[in-house]
Amino acid sequence: MREQLLAVERVQAIEWRDGALYLLDQRLLPHRQTWLRFDHAAEVADAIRDMVVRGAPAIGIAAAYGLVLGARARLQAGGDWREALEADFARLEQSRPTAVNLFWALQRMRERLARLKDDGEVLGQLEAEAVGIHASDREANLTMAQLGMELIRKHQGNPQVVLTHCNAGALATGGFGTALGVIRAAHLEGLLEHVYVDETRPWLQGARLTAWELAGDGVPVSLNVDAAAAHLMKTKGITWVIVGADRITANGDVANKIGTYQLAVNAMHHGMRFMVVAPSSTIDMSLESGDDILLEERSGSELLEVAGQPVAADVPAVNPVFDVTPADLVDYIVTEKGVIERPDSTKLAQLMCRKRLH
């Protein structure tokens, strides 16, 4: 399966070359593929905040490279560069509050930095750490794709019909995707009949990104409005809902793109399986439950325009970006360390003690 996935690799969102970070501007997809160059930590933080790059693993990778850029500038400026670098840590941490991969990646960079005493080694070592985070996520994607595909094979009768939400693909990660990695692997193994993709308002990550990724790979895919999901579950033979995650707490609660919670409720009602695919860096054992997660809300202005024209201009809009799916609605959590069925705090703790499978 690894070789099959590598053979069809087509999309990347992040590149590090010649000492600079390049990000595919996801706000412009699918109409334009524009790469932007970043040379400063503040620019990377703004790119994360403004959704040039999005998806929990990709945000973490971008932040790690952003810290390298910050360290380079601080070293060149001289003086107490370590203290000055704290401003870059803070700005990157504040860019998006919900995706724990951001904080995990920056903590890895901080720990590597703390071990370095020779200023001459700092840039090379921090760059190696960031490149390692990027490469590790790609390997995790491959492992999760295999594990998730095997779950689908285990339950397969006829080819399966899948519903997915938002974008948990190559554009959201350093590799092939989390949820879409599983979907890609299942397609390559002939286990999929069709994939339905929620459009995922208001940024339309499903319509602009996921449908584009899957169609480009030859996966049979249809786009639907978010509100049609329950109807499709009832009428289209859907057997799996497969999503990614931005944060998973110690008890197995899952924070993901707004609309995920209602998919899980409807999946349970209709008797279909609900799979969450995320690297172990998404699991936050410091938070007991989803009630402890800081859930990002974005400006209501994102909901008050259609094609650049104002609608309901005098009405306030509520725009939560994430919701929390309780663990008891989740059938499987798939990570690079293994699979948890019916997650709870004991199973999550045991998983986090394991070494990676790849």
Swiss-Prot record:
Keywords: Amino-acid biosynthesis, Isomerase, Methionine biosynthesis. Substrate binds at residues 54-56, 96, 205, 256-257. The record marks 166 as: Transition state stabilizer. It is an enzyme of class 5 (isomerase). The keyword Transcription regulation does not apply. Pathway: Amino-acid biosynthesis; L-methionine biosynthesis via salvage pathway; L-methionine from S-methyl-5-thio-alpha-D-ribose 1-phosphate: step 1/6. Its EC number is 5.3.1.23. It holds the Pfam family IF-2B. It catalyses: 5-(methylsulfanyl)-alpha-D-ribose 1-phosphate = 5-(methylsulfanyl)-D-ribulose 1-phosphate. The keyword Amino-acid biosynthesis applies. One of its GO terms (biological process) is L-methionine salvage from methylthioadenosine. InterPro entries: IF-2B-related, IF-M1Pi, IF_2B-like_C, Initiation_fac_2B_a/b/d, M1Pi_N, NagB/RpiA_transferase-like. The active site is at residue 246. One of its GO terms (molecular function) is S-methyl-5-thioribose-1-phosphate isomerase activity. HAMAP family: Salvage_MtnA (MF_01678). NCBIfam families: eIF-2B_rel, PRK05720.1, salvage_mtnA. Belongs to the eIF-2B alpha/beta/delta subunits family. MtnA subfamily. Catalyzes the interconversion of methylthioribose-1-phosphate (MTR-1-P) into methylthioribulose-1-phosphate (MTRu-1-P). This is Methylthioribose-1-phosphate isomerase. It comes from Ectopseudomonas mendocina (strain ymp). The gene is mtnA.
